[in-house]
């Protein structure tokens, strides 16, 4: 009776608690559980008896609530068995913090999983000196992204494994700490700090055997910072000052973040890593060559490595060596590898031809007429021949793929044997080392050499297995849009006769066309200066003589699209405050984060024609801004980006000296300007711009005035343009010679050049054509005739207006 009387109140209380749990938020549930546990503490014997009778699922819920209460209210634990019941019996023991949140680089070096590191001997020696200090033994690697900061750490790990370090660093473990995984999944306040302290405790227990590497060390500032807690940097500061060996890495810009905390920055000893030279990069690529050959199953020629270093340094300007050169080699190898995994072009062509024949045979199967039967027999013979050829090429392709795979496996085995040799030498297993050095490795080297020699024989090769300089050039061209490939025969002919292509659009300006053509040929031949733009020109002359049109024609020749000109109308930059729009507004101003119009356009199109139209209308500060562009081929925008102009053609047009050309020139039949007048125009320009600006322009070209003979050629060009527009309607336009002469006479204006002719054609021909098209007097597929009647230019209709109305009524 006493037992039931004692048990009943507690059961009622638990039932009420369950009801409250279902109807109230979680916080009230925790409070009710707390009260229940307090009542258990008041009567321990009754509580123990009650708990022994509760089912397993109830025990589990109490255990969970107990764990939550312990963390929130500091209550003592129940029996450990209750908590353990919730645990998975198959759960693995927790990993050590260093293994969980870090990567052991020395272990990777022992297994041969790190790439070889070439050079950087001085920087590695400096890092070893700092690590050997008693306090503040924390080197900080500072350098641009891609110069090899992380690779230097890999090199240090390899030296530790090889024993090429002082005794104080031998047998040490170099562990790369992952700050991302350290903070990922930290749900409760203080959990991140607890993880970090566990890592530091394990490092302390190692008694100096562990060296920590932290990449992107600027992330320590503010990492894990919440209300009332410390960030990671404040937790690490005491350890860094008392002997914790920590190597860090960051960029020049991000090191400024660390410098804002003097207490943290003084604990690191900076080591500056400069970008390696082109020759050093070539040495690095030669050291990595074998790893990439084994991975991709291809061969890499030495000329490809040299081209990767040279071309990346020349054309990829927003990144740094050796990273960008390694990327070129890697991508070129990947392209070749994908070609190996897909069918060659010859086999694909045969597949398509066989499919076409099979479809045609299927359609002729039921035909019995002699012509169809004869055609079917011819197709069957052709199909048999093509199938035989396909089988032959497929066998060759399969054999070549197997041969390439065999070479790849042999190289992989050779590399693994060399790794085992180094391991045996470190461990003192000289018997196995002798077997590897004098037996297995020479056999594998001989096998690789014989396989490559047989692959280079005179037999037919469907697969190209060597990465050459041409492959590197193609990758550069795809990445940057700059044509760096070897000039093909068709392109050679096109470049040699470039003047003829430009003269199809611009006539009467032979000197300017020749100067631009020479500049483009120099660039494609690889003979331009590496420190300046391809060319810079100032086009002078009266309005309407073809200055802007020649620039558009150049863009069409280079890019097959005249809209590929980066054009700036300098009338928009007349005021001083508008000049900043070219490179971006200063910090604090509107649109200061969007960059400049000029710099952003060239960053996205590094190979382009940049046109500054009507340059004399711009503010004088614009010419000062272009001094560095014309001389050094680069410009820095408001965001600090260094924009490369070395692959651009700079063209400035101006009407300076127009009055001299109109008044002082004796115009001949060809419209050419004499030397004395040209000198006067150039002198007028020199008075308008400072000498340092004039001296940086490659060539000042004075455009000839348009004579009537030249204007007659322009009439033909404009009529051809109209014909191109009418091609969609299957229409043609036909002008008599008399009509063309009429346009030449009426459209000629010594002051305004060719623009009056354009307006005349628009007014006299296009307006009438538009009216007749709408009325149906000229229809699609017909020829538009233009003649001269009674000294007037007339477009002749092909149908009467009334006839069109009747047809429309019938419809």
UniProtKB/Swiss-Prot annotation:
The keyword Transmembrane helix does not apply. InterPro entries: AAA+_ATPase (IPR003593), ATPase_AAA_core (IPR003959), Clp_ATPase_C (IPR019489), ClpA/B (IPR001270), ClpA/B_CS1 (IPR018368), ClpA/B_CS2 (IPR028299), ClpA/ClpB_AAA_lid (IPR041546), ClpA_ClpB (IPR050130). Induction: By heat stress. Expressed at a higher level in respiring cells than in fermenting cells (at protein level). ATP 1 binds at residues 143-150. Keywords: ATP-binding, Chaperone, Coiled coil, Mitochondrion, Nucleotide-binding, Repeat, Stress response, Transit peptide. SUPFAM superfamilies: P-loop containing nucleoside triphosphate hydrolases. Residues 1-44 form a transit peptide. ATP 2 binds at residues 541-548. PROSITE patterns: CLPAB_1, CLPAB_2. Residues 467-658 are annotated as: NBD2. It holds the Pfam family AAA_lid_9. Residues 345-430 form a coiled coil. It is found in: Mitochondrion matrix. Residues 98-344 are annotated as: NBD1. One of its GO terms (biological process) is protein unfolding. One of its GO terms (cellular component) is mitochondrion. One of its GO terms (molecular function) is ATP hydrolysis activity. Belongs to the ClpA/ClpB family. PANTHER family: ATP-DEPENDENT CLP PROTEASE, HEAT SHOCK PROTEIN 78, MITOCHONDRIAL. Required, in concert with mitochondrial Hsp70 (SSC1), for the dissociation, resolubilization and refolding of aggregates of damaged proteins in the mitochondrial matrix after heat stress. May extract proteins from aggregates by unfolding and threading them in an ATP-dependent process through the axial channel of the protein hexamer, after which they can be refolded by the Hsp70 chaperone system. Required for resumption of mitochondrial respiratory function, DNA synthesis and morphology after heat stress. Present with 2990 molecules/cell in log phase SD medium. Has 2 AAA ATPase type nucleotide-binding domains (NBDs) per monomer. NBD1 is primarily responsible for ATP hydrolysis. NBD2 is crucial for oligomerization. Homohexamer, forming a ring with a central pore. The hexamer is stabilized by high protein concentrations and by ADP or ATP. Oligomerization influences ATP hydrolysis activity. This is Heat shock protein 78, mitochondrial. It comes from Saccharomyces cerevisiae (strain ATCC 204508 / S288c) (Baker's yeast). The lineage of its organism: Eukaryota, Fungi, Dikarya, Ascomycota, Saccharomycotina.
